[in-house]
Amino acid sequence: MTNQQHDHDFDHDRRSFASRTPVNNNPDKVVYRRGFVTRHQVTGWRFVMRRIAAGIALHDTRMLVDPLRTQSRAVLMGVLIVITGLIGSFVFSLIRPNGQAGSNAVLADRSTAALYVRVGEQLHPVLNLTSARLIVGRPVSPTTVKSTELDQFPRGNLIGIPGAPERMVQNTSTDANWTVCDGLNAPSRGGADGVGVTVIAGPLEDTGARAAALGPGQAVLVDSGAGTWLLWDGKRSPIDLADHAVTSGLGLGADVPAPRIIASGLFNAIPEAPPLTAPIIPDAGNPASFGVPAPIGAVVSSYALKDSGKTISDTVQYYAVLPDGLQQISPVLAAILRNNNSYGLQQPPRLGADEVAKLPVSRVLDTRRYPSEPVSLVDVTRDPVTCAYWSKPVGAATSSLTLLAGSALPVPDAVHTVELVGAGNGGVATRVALAAGTGYFTQTVGGGPDAPGAGSLFWVSDTGVRYGIDNEPQGVAGGGKAVEALGLNPPPVPIPWSVLSLFVPGPTLSRADALLAHDTLVPDSRPARPVSAEGGYR
């Protein structure tokens, strides 16, 4: 290689921006990696550029201070701050836009949060969002605008439904769970007084000392003010405590405790059953037309084999002698019949299993009227809370009612009770317990287990008020124009009228009522109660 060629290659390598990083460790024959410049080369180039700029601008290349670099950093920070502000403003405009009235039907004043609804060319002040949605016919949300934007429209009269709910958030539960409790002297959650009628919506809490379902053979003896009743197996049966044939047959004994007073709200929520009296048997005392050693109306017995899973034992079965045959009865009904008239028999005549099999079978008596085993009464001094729990899972054909008893209300910890101002007026409950912030879209049904859900539609709020819904049909079961406007999702949750009637009656939610104009609103004539500024009632 000539010196001229060597100088040309050296000059090319010196002027190129290729990396001069060696890729081998042989000092005799160094091979350089070809590629981009290294970080050290870049920082060195930047330093040279700053030094040249300092020499031109400051006439000093010593660079004891570097004011030009401080200025560039300040400019960069300013640009970053401006960009951050622009991004923040964009995000804020998405979260809280400065709305325009446009074609929006429901508007809200940004400064006062007052609601307005457009009807035709006029802008009407509206009492609440529920009324505005009924007027518009769909569940719209208000568009927040400035007051100057609202002043551009001609103003109309005040319209809306006084007392309509401000917020209607439907509870996600589709199962019907309604509980009515009556406490004599029971603390509710948080130590509040639990005396009176309490309506609970949703699943119950039955842990600890809270009211739980009555056990087998348990019952509650109550006084409704018009008679004595026995609460058992999800129903209430009239009972005469002076009829010792019945009380003894039920296992109450001679010393029956005084019945507890029951509130009408709980009393009406429990379905009525036939009275607990000795059944009337036709031709009682006459000889039977079939071969039994007892007259009609008497009781006979027989032994039957019972398989308990581990052992097989003999059990006594009782039969009532009826005009057309024998009917198997429970020990309680057998005791009631014998206490009423044993027909001179010290013991029920015993028949063989083969003899019973040959005799005709009768079904004259309604054995469901009577408990299948002797009952034990709940000690109301220890368990002063009595409840009726009505439930119907979604899709179920029948409902069920369970009686509860305990020392405290079965209110879940996450649910707080609301004391009703109109408690006791027109059968209104003392308090309600619903999940805060949600309500129930309901439909009334009968109290019976097979009652169909074809009643009126109601909205039950978390403050204990029931609002009737104008259910103008629209082709969907449980749905209508008002239901669609309010944004409610069918199907409604069934609720017995005996439970629904315990809520405070509110106005009907309909478009016709929402379009009523007002000059002013008269004070509420219903009972009121002042609330202190610190919270609670005075």
UniProtKB/Swiss-Prot annotation:
GO terms for cellular component: extracellular region; peptidoglycan-based cell wall; plasma membrane. It is a single-pass membrane protein. GO terms for molecular function: ATP binding; hydrolase activity. Disulfide bonds: none annotated. Induction: Repressed by IdeR in the presence of iron and by Zur in the presence of zinc. Its EC number is 3.6.-.-. It is found in: Cell inner membrane. The chain crosses the membrane at residues 75-95. Residues 1-16 have a biased composition (Basic and acidic residues). Residues 1-25 are annotated as: Disordered. Pfam families: T7SS_ESX1_EccB. InterPro entries: T7SS_EccB, T7SS_EccB_R1, T7SS_EccB_R3. Keywords: ATP-binding, Cell inner membrane, Cell membrane, Hydrolase, Membrane, Nucleotide-binding, Transmembrane, Transmembrane helix, Transport. Part of the ESX-3 / type VII secretion system (T7SS), which is composed of cytosolic and membrane components. The ESX-3 membrane complex is composed of EccB3, EccC3, EccD3 and EccE3. An ATPase. Part of the ESX-3 specialized secretion system, which is important for iron and zinc uptake or homeostasis. Belongs to the EccB family. NCBIfam families: T7SS_EccB. PANTHER family: ESX-2 SECRETION SYSTEM ATPASE ECCB2. This is ESX-3 secretion system ATPase EccB3. It comes from Mycobacterium tuberculosis (strain ATCC 25618 / H37Rv). The lineage of its organism: Bacteria, Bacillati, Actinomycetota, Actinomycetes, Mycobacteriales. The gene is eccB3.
